[in-house]
Amino acid sequence: MQILRGCIALFVWGAFTFSTEIILAQPEPQVISSRFRESVSLDVNNTVLKKMGSVRDYLSEQQWEDAVKILIQISDEYGDSLYPEAPGRYLRVSEYCQNLLAGFPPEAIAIYREKVDPRAKRWYEEALAGSGRQPLVNITEQALMSSYGDDALNLLGEMAWEEGQLAEARSLWRKLIPRTASDSPVYDTGLFHYPDTDLPVPEILARLILVSFFQGNFSQADFEQGQFRKKYSQATGRLAGKEGNLSDLLAEILADPSRVSLTDNRSELKTFAGHQTRNFKAAQPPEIGAVDWSFPVPLVWSQEFTAKPAFGFRVPPGLFPVVHQEHVFFNDAERIYGLNWKTGLPAWSQDPQSSPILYPSASHRVSRLPFRPVVGVPRYTSTIAGGRLYARMGSPVTSVAKDERLGLFSDLVCLDLDQGQGKLLWKISSAQLREQNFVWSFEGAPVVSGNRLYVVLHRGFPEVQTNVACFSADTGEMIWNQKVCLALRSIEEGVNYISHLLLTLGEDQLYLSTDMGAIASLNTVNGKLNWLVTYPSQDKTDKEELSNHMKTGLVPCLYDRGILFAAPQDSSQLMAFDAESGLLLWQRPWPEQIRNLLGATQSTLVVSGDRLFGLNRATGRITWKTGYHDPEGFGYGRGILAGDFIYWPLREEILVVHTEQGYLKQKISLRKQYGATGGNLVIAGNQLLIASPRRLTAFGTDGQIPANDSKKISALSIK
């Protein structure tokens, strides 16, 4: 893995950068990892490696025709496989070929265009005739270095802009900025730069400034505008529907921040971490009064854990409720519950004697205990989209012991909330995905986009394999199934293993942290891998540690405005990537196990484990931290961002901490005042709910809970 080359310029143009705010910060010194032994096996084709060697030989001999011919052949025949662009970073072969072509001399590029321009022209004309986005996508994926590649990038960028996909617009327009004399003399195939566009570069740069502005990066936009005025003070063009001097048009727009409608604040928690980007902030802090109601959650076998986690609690806080309108829903391995979050009554009922169980029917048979030992932490997630609830049900075991007698299958179920009051629409069993006597398991709950859902698949034999699959959200029918990576099994064959991987969905791209040495980006349309990065994986085999919820978290990637944050559970590194390219922005070793990426604001990334930390999102520098030194005061459950504050649960209290400055505003006692415990926090309306291991508790708005004076909390380390 490497630090993003050339600073992160999503493009650097002289002293002018079009990144997010990366260039403005002073990053901490970082050590670039040397080559390491990768823990995963990837679909890298040896034939491609050999043919790429031939391409380089022909280039060195200036045999342009032969080099271009082989490169086109490689892209056509092996385009969907992976190529090691740099140590620890892999690109799809078709993309790497285009990146490489962009660095060819003009005479070689001319030969390439003679061969591919007729096809690219046909696609471009189809797009102009009203065939939509796909012909343009065909150009960018198969003929980006054609004479029509820049036009396709420009039009796709405009479409993304109009749809509010600002990070996607940035990544498309950024590729139109050519390299300059100030760049490294060694051509870098890590990022694509169209070398000879005839589009007006100042106009494209001005659009990139607007992207920064409308993403809420006001200081970055001001900086970029200042650099733009120095370089292109007399440039004219069209911007935001107006013709004129581009600097003046920019100044007029940037002078009015009220034009910007930020999407940081979200209304309802629809999935784990609130949103499918895994980045959620409630608009307003909850009004925490007395306990309004509580619901005891019956235990199932998968919660009665065999290992003993910290403090004698056998059951981890593994329930993650979701909210839809006036109802809150949560599930365990066997049942899905629905409650009215205002009253605590069963969903769609005024009768307290009604059953809160939406799924399954009363005739459902209770699961049996596995025959072989179980290692891991059971967790339960669901997703609400389009008025439907999608949940991962069944055995939490994802890697079944070789001699396990029981069929430990898992299910995906879809319930109709808006029209059917929780009626089952369809169900998929992992038993249906059997392949050569080896059964797949569903990992965590899916993410949903339009009429498609995406979920991680796992199987433990003959090797550990992680896939991402796409299903119809309407019928449950599989659309595609993409292998991500293989790895050797680290847990002995006679043990069942529990995992719960979750995808992240950001601007129509999927992201997955595999927790076994790889992080990947996939295309939602066809499942093709966009990029994959590897890192040194710590081979964890201690059963007690793997089964201790205080030692391992549920940490999918967090996507925020073009940056992807990752804290793999098999690594001590916290990392930030450019989400479009997979290039590393920064990484830093972490002093303790990160169990939650809680959210990212305009300037701060919030993470938690035993303690709570705020980091500069641009550099990874720790700006503040808070928490107890006593292990009994460590973080317990998942917190939530609301307004300007973080509500962070401990076992016996909730700390309310300012997100940007890290000062303690309030300490809410749970155990002492109400005999309650911490857990996973949920905000429904203006109420706070706590999903502790055995109970869901709702706090009303009447009778404020007493808050301890933060000045007396000497055990807290606040910085």
Give each language-model segment a name:
Residues 57, 120-123, 237-319, 340-373, ...:
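Aromatic (tryptophan-biased) beta-strands that constitute blades/sheets of beta-rich domains
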Residues 34-49, 103-126, 143-144, 192-200, ...:
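TPR-adjacent "capping" and linker segments in tetratricopeptide-repeat scaffold/adaptor proteins
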Residues 35-38, 42, 76-96, 106-111, ...:
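Short solvent-exposed coil/turn linkers within tandem alpha-helical repeat scaffolds
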